[in-house]
């Protein structure tokens, strides 16, 4: 799942080398923290959070298939 978030984020930003995804798993729950360069933050979030919501929706679908809970944080 970490790789999927990283691929999606790198395709959106101008500085793909600054994209870092941290994964923290506890039991059946996974927290993915997406770090991007400050100037790319708006591109990852999108207008009214649409891009961020789309990323979270895709990850929720993947997590449902794998029977886990996933939270995507953009920091």
Predicted regions and their residues:
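RNA-contacting regions in translation and RNA-metabolism proteins
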Residues: 1-43, 47, 53-75
């Amino acid at each position: 799942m970490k790789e999927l978030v990283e691929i999606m984020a790198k395709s959106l930003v101008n500085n793909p080398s600054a994209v870092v995804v941290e994964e923290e798993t506890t039991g059946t729950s996974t927290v993915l923290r997406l770090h991007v360069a400050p100037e790319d933050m708006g591109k990852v979030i999108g207008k009214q959070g649409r891009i961020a919501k789309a990323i979270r929706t895709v990850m929720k679908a993947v997590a449902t298939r794998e029977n886990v809970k996933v939270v995507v944080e953009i920091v």
